């Protein structure tokens, strides 16, 4: 039986791979490196310049379809990462373990298998000591070649890898779509609230007000003991950066804009409805009868309240300072129309984000079942 037609089998990497150690000091191939999350990237993307220096002459000249294993530990890949080069060629650090797969196997599939999180179990056993001073794991080329792979026939490898490639392309498209929607929404918010939108500018006159004149409530939330906040509970607890947890009592009931008052993301805004608990690190904002709360969500975001935070060890917003800020607003009916228009973007974005979560979940499930 031809090896390409064999059913699933277990084989050491060294039996299907061979070392690549070619160098070419005269090569003009791009200088690249391995990123745990993105694969091969230009070295200048991370270091602002190519920092190979005198060691460049020792860099490995990798060709398209060959692989490199970066045995450097990172947060994303604790035991290093392995990727196939898809560019025609590249010069890469000589500390990488470089190799090529023989023609009886489908290289993209092998690359996926080697970069799968389940491979960490084997790599962990190979680490002979702690991380070296240069940040590299003590995994030699010979050690790496000893890891075992569970391989189907060549044709099945190709079918699987090609399907996952299409899925990755679909995920990348979804990410670009979400980025475009968010960018378009930001542009729409700026265009409308700066008074440049003829559709809404002509609809009513815009008048200047302070934030205090627009709101029936604009105050910090209430103090709550950390012992009362749990992973589960009846009501969400909002702090300066979003939901902190849940508790069994509420401080606010209704529709409010929550502004983060303290923390790294102070000035962030979100709309909440129903019963919630707002801690002292959040500001509860509710429009008065002449204005619309949903409109304030976009207005406060447009005003970038974070720029008014007091600088210090813990950035924070002073409510009395924010209440004096001035802004231009239309009448309530126009506010409602603007809020409805902008919320349609939020609905589209959240719908597409749910689709992205589903696609990523399906990918993880497939990889979990494929590689053992």
Where are these regions (language model features)?
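Amphipathic alpha-helical coiled-coil/heptad-repeat segments
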Residues: 4-11, 15, 151-207, 326-372
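Non-catalytic DNA-recognition/assembly elements of restriction-modification systems
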Residues: 4-24, 146, 200-222, 227-237
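Short, ligand-facing micro-motifs at secondary-structure edges
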Residues: 26-48, 67-70, 74-93, 108-112, ...
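Short alpha-helix capping/helix-loop boundary micro-motifs
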Residues: 47-56
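Generic structural signal for buried aliphatic residues
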Residues: 62, 67-68, 342
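Ligand-binding loop in jelly-roll beta-barrel domains
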Residues: 101-106, 288-291
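A short glycine-rich beta-alpha junction/loop motif
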Residues: 90-95, 129-155, 277-281, 313-333
